[in-house]
């Protein structure tokens, strides 16, 4: 047993002791757009595990959409037992509404991010527009598909990946601003979430390149349009860390804390990590990551803390009202 798993298993044991005598329980997981397939498999695995451990049947219901929009729904009263969103700022917004504590990231390993991803490009077979790196997305005549950063967490990662690449390469915020503005000038449609953008590109045939979560690009290539797409890995991208959290006010009111806590902790178990890897997320557990290493290309990654000083600062400067993104869109 690894040192990393001991506290998780101990917490699971404590959760079992705290379990109320209810034969069946339902949880709501409010998640972001492209996790549908991941949680469909994970929910079934956890339900089987939980019943074997406790005798209690658990049903997990899902809600999916753009991460920012989902966070607002929880703040507005959607009774999520757990949230599994695209970025920590969206869960911070739920904490600001006093639905969970501000130190929520300290409650699970790796700042409550059981898996990671990054941002890559999906192009049509043969790469007809010869897309190789971020600069190519701002070329005239290249139609770029990405969702709206105002509603989509994935879109915010996309935007920051492009900005961080340019700021690092050129050593200039002005050149980073120009590149990102050029990319968004080439965007014909801003869907509200990442899955909507995937559908626009894959099923509707719009655009030359999709800026996408790595897991979404791999899913599209392998399962949604086999033989129709290629993945282009840029020279540098951002380490995307989608976090998870318990919504304390809801679980305490619904008496679901024990099973909801176990649900999140099981994401860190070997089975939970294997499921994440099968659905193209980069697992945290080293042994699982090693088994799936060929699936995930090596790429130079920077973090939001390194390039932007964290989500609070990035959100205010780039995505707040009147911020960089609003000014870009106003100038289009």
Question: Residue locations for each model-derived region?
Answer:
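Short beta-strand->loop
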Residues: 30-32, 123-125, 143-169, 183-187, ...
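N-terminal secretory signal peptides that target proteins for export/translocation
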Residues: 1-5
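Ligand-binding pocket segment of bilobal, Venus flytrap-like solute-binding proteins
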Residues: 169-235
């Amino acid at each position: 047993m690894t040192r990393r798993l001991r506290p998780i298993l101990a917490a699971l044991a404590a959760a079992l002791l705290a379990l109320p005598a209810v034969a069946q329980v339902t949880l709501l997981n409010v998640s972001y757009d492209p996790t549908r397939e991941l949680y469909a498999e994970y929910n079934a695995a956890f339900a089987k595990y939980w019943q074997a451990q406790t005798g209690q049947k658990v049903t997990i219901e899902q809600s999916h959409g753009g991460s920012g929009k989902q966070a607002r729904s929880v703040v507005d009263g959607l009774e999520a037992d757990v949230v599994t969103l695209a970025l920590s700022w969206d869960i911070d917004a739920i904490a600001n509404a006093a639905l969970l504590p501000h130190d929520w990231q300290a409650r699970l390993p790796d700042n409550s991010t059981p898996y990671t991803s990054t941002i890559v490009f999906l192009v049509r077979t043969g790469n007809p527009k010869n897309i190789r790196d971020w600069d190519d997305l701002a070329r005239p005549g290249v139609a770029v598909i990405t969702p709206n950063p105002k509603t989509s967490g994935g879109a915010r990662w996309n935007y920051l990946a492009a900005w961080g690449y340019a700021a690092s390469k050129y050593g200039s915020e002005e050149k980073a601003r120009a590149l990102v503005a050029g990319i968004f000038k080439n965007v014909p449609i801003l869907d509200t979430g990442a899955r909507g953008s995937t559908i626009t590109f894959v099923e509707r045939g719009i655009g030359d390149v999709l800026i996408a979560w790595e897991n979404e690009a791999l899913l599209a290539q392998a399962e949604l349009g086999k033989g129709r797409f290629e993945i282009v890995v840029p020279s540098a991208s951002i380490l995307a860390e989608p976090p998870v959290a318990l919504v304390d006010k809801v679980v305490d009111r619904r008496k679901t804390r024990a099973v909801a806590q176990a649900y999140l902790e099981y994401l860190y178990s070997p089975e939970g990590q294997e499921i994440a890897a099968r659905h193209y997320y980069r697992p945290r557990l080293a042994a699982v990551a090693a088994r799936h290493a060929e699936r995930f290309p090596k790429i130079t990654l920077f973090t939001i803390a390194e390039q932007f000083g964290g989500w609070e600062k990035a959100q205010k400067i780039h995505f707040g009202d009147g911020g960089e993104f609003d000014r870009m869109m106003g100038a289009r």
